[in-house]
Amino acid sequence: MTEKTLASPKPSEIPIANNFKKVFRQYGGILSGMVVLIILFSFINDSFFTANNITNIILQVSIIAITAYGMTYVLLLGDINLSVGSTIALIGTFAALGASWGIPFILLVPLSIIAALALGMINGGLTAIAGIPSFIVTVATMGIFRGIAYIVTDGMPIMIKDDAFLALGNGEFLYIPIPIWILIILLLINHFILTKTTFGRKIYITGGNKEAAIYSGINVTRLKIKVFMITAVLAGISGMILASRLYSGQPNSALSYELDAIAAAVLGGTSLNGGYGTVVGTVIGALTIGVINNGMNLMNVPYFYQMVVKGLVILVAVYFDVRNKRKRS
């Protein structure tokens, strides 16, 4: 009777090892950078690496991250949406006005989402059907949406007194702020959509090669409209959370949030040329920006210098995006 010996599997043959390598290859750079920043700011200021401050960082980036989830969809198609900041302001003021008219919060949520869908349909229709470049369309609607927010409010903030509405941005569940729960839930939902559904695969295929997508039977026009609608809905959710946190709908809120959303997505590995990126990378990018902002605030760095740093971060992220594109091609 002979004895059979089983060969030990190589590390590359172990699923867990493969998954770890894949995750590290995809997110290792940005995660390493974030860890270095956390260590640096922790040495500079003792109050940085505390439970309260870490929670505060996540809470502060939640609105940008949720908006950036939507931006990821658009960038994956090779388009862009510069109207998300104005969408946040308009939906926030819309919801605040509804609350001031006595509309129950349980009705305000679907009404605000429907309003956001309409804004997304405008952007998507002008881009996909009229054939106007998304950059031009969303620059125009950025001004239009913001202008409407000023018109309906007479340029004044609309105070929110509805307790349920205020709980959206300021309440807690199991000692964790509600915006963080929303951030996590939307991360899981959008990650599932992009990685496990036919709709998500169509987005990657279209962003990677539009001609091939058309030849394979994908209705690119319909897909693009849906993507812009999703982006608007996520911006609308951010708008309701921001209005709640500010205790008012403000037409001048969310200024330059579109740049923060783009920075988070690109820093997290989403390509500006389409076809490559994930919402997991996007949330890591948003958290990295949050760490930078929080660290500089604790160091009392003036806001104008923070703008310079944020601009440099975007430039570096775009540089690596271009370099990675050359490698992939």
Over which residues does each language-model region extend?
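Transmembrane alpha-helical segments in multi-pass inner-membrane proteins
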Residues: A235, R245-G311
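Short loop segments and helix-boundary regions at transmembrane helix junctions
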Residues: A17-V23, I80, A115-I158, K196-T198, ...
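Hydrophobic core segments of alpha-helical transmembrane domains in multi-pass membrane transport
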Residues: I30-S42, M71, R146, I182-F192, ...
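Helix-loop-helix "hairpin" substructures at the membrane interface of multi-pass membrane proteins
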Residues: P104-P110, A118-N123, T127, F173-G249
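Single transmembrane alpha-helix segments in multi-pass membrane proteins
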Residues: V35-W101, L126-G131, G269-V279, L312
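Membrane-interfacial amphipathic/re-entrant helices at transmembrane-helix boundaries
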Residues: T2-I66, G102-L107, I218, K226
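Transmembrane helix-bundle core of multi-pass membrane transporters
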Residues: A130, S134-T197, L223-K226, R245-A254, ...
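Hydrophobic alpha-helical transmembrane segments
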Residues: Y27-S32, I57, A65, S86-L90, ...
